[in-house]
Amino acid sequence: MTAAVTSSNIVLETHESGIKPYFEQKIQETELKIRSKTENVRRLEAQRNALNDKVRFIKDELRLLQEPGSYVGEVIKIVSDKKVLVKVQPEGKYIVDVAKDINVKDLKASQRVCLRSDSYMLHKVLENKADPLVSLMMVEKVPDSTYDMVGGLTKQIKEIKEVIELPVKHPELFESLGIAQPKGVILYGPPGTGKTLLARAVAHHTDCKFIRVSGAELVQKYIGEGSRMVRELFVMAREHAPSIIFMDEIDSIGSTRVEGSGGGDSEVQRTMLELLNQLDGFETSKNIKIIMATNRLDILDPALLRPGRIDRKIEFPPPSVAARAEILRIHSRKMNLTRGINLRKVAEKMNGCSGADVKGVCTEAGMYALRERRIHVTQEDFELAVGKVMNKNQETAISVAKLFK
């Protein structure tokens, strides 16, 4: 009896041990199928959503194609809560109604809008298009130049602060005095005297959008392109106010107009006329300031330099001995100098040099130290650098004297 029970238990255990792995395997296979089906369903749902988006896009395109065409206009002025003055090219200016779904308070001057072809009702607001070349003129990262990095220009820094920085930071002072804010300033002087460096420092301290453009970039091949770029430049400045427009080498488009000029000169004159129009048009309360720089003030058109357009002219003369010594201290303060270097003596030997030449002397002095495998700069390195930068024979004379020491 006991033997029979034992044999039956063995058969049952063997049966269970064979069934359990079988069902476990089936469960795993079923779970894999479920996961596969679930992933397939998700993939099909994603495809369905993508196709639905395409269908909606095509329906919108079809609806737009079936609608009557619209005129593109430019907002000039808001007349009332339901009326807007719009300019349409080439027809003219119209006072039009505004659709109910558009808030008139959101409209701004120079904004592009759509007008219905039948009723001239304003029914859509468009984004202002900008030339990629004009968009690239905006400097996204404000220069890290400060007034401490500008040497020998104490008077010029004070004057440009009064014209550019003070109206931006404290406009209430001009309102209390009852005077108009200055619109712009022109910096003139020989090359390398610090005009661009000071403009970068102003952009850093005023915390404004800095738009830098060279006058040569506004000289275009086709008729009207330069004028259009000037208009878009000031539109971009108004959109990102407060902003500073720095126009370098303004003499390339602002030279004096002469009779009988044609071809490329006439296009340059049209560009300058558009610039004059924009300088007269934009309001000083918009916190848009313009800085111009040139090496040739004598050839600029008097209409560009009159008060009301350019309110101050700041001269950048060649630096004096004291100014050159200060510039040397600024550019050499991070250099590894030996003791006893007399920068004043170095500055006295650089008659007629500009600030850029002084910076070049510091660089050349470091190069002379590298040639002799030294990690410090000596007085003699500066004297050799002065001779090289000033293009004189001092380098040869000093080298010969060094041999007989």
Curated annotation (Swiss-Prot):
N-acetylthreonine sites (modified residues): 2
GO biological process: chromatin remodeling; nonfunctional rRNA decay; nucleotide-excision repair; positive regulation of RNA polymerase II transcription preinitiation complex assembly; positive regulation of transcription elongation by RNA polymerase II; proteasome regulatory particle assembly; proteasome-mediated ubiquitin-dependent protein catabolic process
Signal peptide per UniProt: none
Keyword Cytoplasm tagged: yes
Gene3D superfamilies: 1.10.8.60, Nucleic acid-binding proteins, P-loop containing nucleotide triphosphate hydrolases
Subcellular location: Cytoplasm; Nucleus
SUPFAM superfamilies reported for this sequence: P-loop containing nucleoside triphosphate hydrolases (SSF52540)
Binding site for ATP: 189-196
Any one cellular-component term (Gene Ontology): proteasome storage granule
Keywords: Acetylation, ATP-binding, Cytoplasm, Nucleotide-binding, Nucleus, Proteasome
GO MF: ATP binding; ATP hydrolysis activity; proteasome-activating activity; protein domain specific binding; ubiquitin protein ligase binding
Database matches in InterPro entries: 26S_Proteasome_ATPase (IPR050221), AAA+_ATPase (IPR003593), AAA_lid_3 (IPR041569), ATPase_AAA_core (IPR003959), ATPase_AAA_CS (IPR003960), NA-bd_OB-fold (IPR012340), P-loop_NTPase (IPR027417), Prot_ATP_ID_OB_2nd (IPR032501)
Modified how: N-acetylated by NAT1.
Summary of the function given for this chain in its UniProt record: The 26S proteasome is involved in the ATP-dependent degradation of ubiquitinated proteins. The regulatory (or ATPase) complex confers ATP dependency and substrate specificity to the 26S complex.
General remark: Present with 4700 molecules/cell in log phase SD medium.
Family named by the database record: Belongs to the AAA ATPase family.
PANTHER family: 26S PROTEASOME REGULATORY SUBUNIT (PTHR23073)
Subunit text: May form a homodimer or a heterodimer with a related family member. Interacts with OLA1, TMA17, and UBR1.
Protein name per its UniProtKB record: 26S proteasome regulatory subunit 8 homolog
Species per Swiss-Prot/TrEMBL record: Saccharomyces cerevisiae (strain ATCC 204508 / S288c) (Baker's yeast)
Gene: RPT6
